[in-house]
Design a protein with these regions (language model features):
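LRR N-terminal entry segment and analogous cap-like coil->beta motifs
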Residues: 51-53, 59-112, 120-122
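Glycine-centered tight-turn motifs at strand-turn-strand junctions
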Residues: 71, 591-607, 620-623
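Conserved hydrophobic beta-strand positions in leucine-rich repeat
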Residues: 84, 103-107, 124-128, 147-149, ...
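Residue-level detector of functionally pivotal "anchor" positions at catalytic/ligand-binding pockets or at interdomain
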Residues: 547-572
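Short, glycine-anchored, charge-dense loop/turn motifs used at functional sites
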Residues: 584-592, 612
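C-terminal tail/sorting-segment detector
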Residues: 609-631
Length: 631
């Protein structure tokens, strides 16, 4: 069946009446599309004719208004076509060799391995990103102004003849070279995640945005780019960066390089700065009063003056060597992360808009949060806090107070709380009756004897190891997918009742069971462990672990200590010689990174605050141990 479209048919007819020229005298454009969609399957194609033009379509049933279905896997478009949008149509081939009027082609998200557009000299806009392209020919397209070819497999790209190009997106390919010296009109160049060692933009004076992050660039000359507003050059091999000729710069992302100093005195328009994971020993921000975001974590800073940054909303200066930090004049702060320093005090009373506060791994003995009524996330683990008053923080959703000196924790006012980590303290009682939204509870290594969870029916993870629990009350464990009660004083009857109350176990891989205890109920080392009835829980798909102690020796050794050790002070993860690889997971099972184990240890300073799990593997790929780490 042939689908026919006419635009302004009456106008075309009148024009033909007034001239002897007929449409048949002009060459007919032909575009062929090959799809793997089955005959009868819906396909989303939008085709627009030129002004006064018409086209026919073979291989499709239907029309643009009601939608098309495939009648043949080779689709042929003939006529005066100005634009084709064939996004996610399972195309494996596009033939443009007989096409000369097309201005716009959108073939994103298909299965193309090659694309030759060189015959379409009228083309102005081409989006072929998110395919499997190993070759792309755009030679001699003098009118092409925008090219989007990112997320492909290109090893080379020639754009020297595309002199009208203003925007080039070629990120996430395998390019080792890129010549843009002939593209003087280029405004936007996005080439991150390639294999570039050099990027020369000296002839691109009109450049406003440059993203060349995650390459292998060692030097970057920006002296000819005075109009530059946004620069992303993170994760390269830069040891120096000169931005003194870029007065319009508003965003600078230069994280994960080898920078030892950075002069920002000529960048008064700067609003966003990210220079984390470098080797900076100082950072002068006196000439950057417009900064709203400052990320300078994991450097060697001993001092940081942010007193002149009244617009600052986000500050992350974690993992430096700061002994003091004054944020009293930063009233607009909504996020403050200063974990992993040597702070003995921090005053956040003027910061009434704070939503996220991370002061973990410092030397704080007290923390006043009375004025921070907007606080939703609080991380203050590994300090020297003996108490923490959260009565004013009624919107708190996440709380991590692990590894302090707390003997009590009052949470009656925190009715929004969903995640609580309070392990490794000396807490004797814990009232959770008001925390009805609680989903995750980590309260290991405390001194709890009883715990009432009657109102906590949304719990998904419940870890209460190494307490003195004799009694636990609950109403419903219907959402639970991880239970750990190791090393308490629980009877066989109580353990049996808790196991019987478990729902169907969640589907979990062996890795998820081992590292995150998904679908695992561990009741080891309790007085009632040996006699607990595990039948129903096992029938519900739970992996029940019920190891028992034999006096001083235990049949359940600490597997982690034989392979992994975490140094909290230096944020270093050390592995024994048997470990070849370490995988880091978030607590919800997301793989964050894989690391080759070494004798010097692995730095975790750039790992986000919170709880993660390190899993050790041998050279043969065998899993050796897992270690839960609080950052």
């Amino acid at each position: 069946m042939r689908a026919v479209s006419h635009r302004r048919l009456l106008l075309s007819f009148l024009l033909l009446l007034g001239t002897e020229v007929v449409m048949g005298q002009s060459p007919t454009d032909i575009i062929r599309l090959q799809t793997t969609k089955a005959v009868g399957e819906e396909i989303n194609i939008e085709i627009a004719a030129t002004e006064g033009g018409a086209f026919t379509v073979e291989g499709l049933n239907g029309n643009e208004d009601d939608g098309y279905t495939v009648s043949a896997q080779t689709i042929v478009v003939k006529g005066d076509v100005e634009s084709i949008i064939c996004y996610k149509c399972d195309l494996v081939q596009i033939d443009l060799s007989a096409c000369h009027r097309l201005r716009k082609l959108d073939c994103r998200g298909n299965k193309l391995t090659t694309l030759d557009a060189s015959a379409v000299d009228s083309l102005q806009w081409l989006a072929c990103n998110d395919n499997e392209l190993t070759a792309l020919n755009v030679d001699n397209l003098k009118r092409l102004s925008e090219l989007y070819c990112h997320n492909n497999k290109l090893t080379s790209l020639q754009v020297s003849t595309n002199e009208a190009l203003t925007q080039l997106y070629c990120a996430t390919n395998a390019l080792s070279t890129l010549d843009v010296s002939k593209n003087a009109q280029l405004h936007v160049l996005i080439c991150h995640q390639n294999q570039l060692q050099v990027i020369d933009v000296s002839n691109n004076a009109a450049l406003i945005q440059l993203s060349c992050a995650e390459n292998q660039i060692t030097k970057l000359d920006l002296s000819h780019n005075a109009a530059l507003k946004t620069l992303g050059c993170g994760v390269n091999k830069l040891t120096s960066l000169d931005v003194s000729r870029n007065p319009a710069l508003e965003t600078l992302l230069a994280y994960e390089n080898g920078l030892t100093n950075l002069d920002l005195s000529k960048n008064p328009a700067l609003q966003r700065l990210s220079v984390g994971n470098n080797s900076l020993t100082a950072l002068d921000l006196h000439q950057n009063p417009l900064l709203t975001q400052l990320k300078c974590k994991q450097n060697n800073l001993t001092d940081l003056d942010v007193s002149g940054l009244e617009k600052l909303a986000v500050l992350d200066c974690s993992d430096n060597q700061l002994t003091r930090l004054n944020v009293e004049r930063n009233a607009a702060l909504s996020t403050l992360r200063c974990a992993g320093n040597q702070l003995e005090s921090v005053n956040v009373q003027p910061n009434v808009w704070l939503v996220t506060l991370d002061v973990s791994h410092n030397k704080l003995a007290e923390l006043d949060l009375a004025t921070n009524t907007m606080l939703a996330e609080l991380y203050c683990a590994d300090n020297q806090l003996t108490s923490v008053n959260l009565e004013s923080n009624t919107g708190l959703r996440t709380l991590d107070v692990e590894k302090n000196k707390l003997d009590s924790l009052k949470l009656e006012a925190n009715t929004m709380l969903a995640g609580l980590a309070c392990g490794h303290n000396a807490i004797k009682t814990l009232n959770l009756s008001a925390n009805v939204r609680l989903k995750e509870l980590y309260c290991v290594d405390n001194k709890l004897e009883t715990l009432d969870l009657t109102n906590n029916t949304k719990l998904k993870m419940l870890h209460l190891d190494s307490n003195q629990l004799r009694e636990i009350s609950w109403a419903n464990f219907g959402k639970l997918y991880s239970l750990s009660l190791v090393g308490n004083q629980l009877s066989a009857d109580l353990l049996s009742q808790m196991l019987d109350a478990l729902p169907k176990a969640p589907e979990a891989t062996e890795e998820e069971q081992t590292s995150f205890k998904w679908g695992v109920a561990d009741i080891s080392e309790n007085p009632g462990t040996a006699n607990a009835n595990t039948t129903k829980a096992s029938e519900n798909g739970w992996k029940v672990v019920a190891k028992v102690s034999t006096g001083i020796q235990t049949l359940r050794p600490n597997e982690a200590e034989a392979y992994l050790r975490y140094d909290q002070v230096g944020a270093m993860l050390h592995a024994t010689a048997a470990v070849a690889k370490i995988a880091l997971y978030s607590i919800d099972g997301r793989l964050m990174r894989q690391i080759e184990a070494g004798q010097e240890g692995v730095s975790l300073r750039d790992v986000p605050a919170g709880i993660c799990v390190a899993v050790a593997y041998s050279r043969s790929g065998k899993r050796l141990a897992s270690l839960r780490i609080a950052r």
